[in-house]
């Protein structure tokens, strides 16, 4: 599953489209929500987690992009990323019941949350998309 973002009125063809798979998008959008909780509505934040064609207008989009870029230079991103990675390291294994024929076994596996990735390069690409998209639709 992935998230396709379509620019409303891009400055150029380069900024017409942005895509992320779920493992990268969820941490990215959570970071955006934290940086932008004073400008995004609860509905904006919630809808960012779904492919419901929700639109973030140009004004908000530009602010989001600028805040992301600023967070790289003032260590907000670094601090958030360090905390994110530390939390992932601390996750316990998860137990699952496995039924096959007459055996009921329990297996342990790494938490699926460890698959989430907060990637600075992707976040920078998203920030530039936001600034130049004219607003965007999350599909």
Predicted regions and their residues:
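Acidic (Asp/Glu-rich) sequence patches and key acidic residues
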Residues: 1-139
């Amino acid at each position: 599953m992935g998230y396709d973002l379509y620019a409303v009125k891009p400055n150029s063809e380069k900024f017409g489209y942005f895509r992320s798979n779920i493992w990268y998008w969820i941490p990215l959008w959570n970071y955006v929500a934290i940086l932008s909780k004073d400008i995004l509505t609860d509905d904006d934040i919630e809808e960012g987690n779904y492919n419901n064609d929700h639109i973030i207008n140009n004004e908000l989009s530009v602010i989001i992009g600028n805040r992301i870029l600023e967070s790289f230079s003032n260590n907000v991103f670094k601090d958030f990323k360090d905390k994110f990675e530390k939390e992932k390291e601390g996750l316990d294994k998860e137990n699952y019941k496995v039924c096959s024929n007459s055996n009921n076994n329990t297996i342990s596996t790494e938490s699926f949350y460890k698959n989430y990735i907060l990637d600075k390069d992707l976040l920078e690409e998203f920030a530039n998309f936001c600034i130049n998209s004219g607003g965007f639709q999350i599909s």
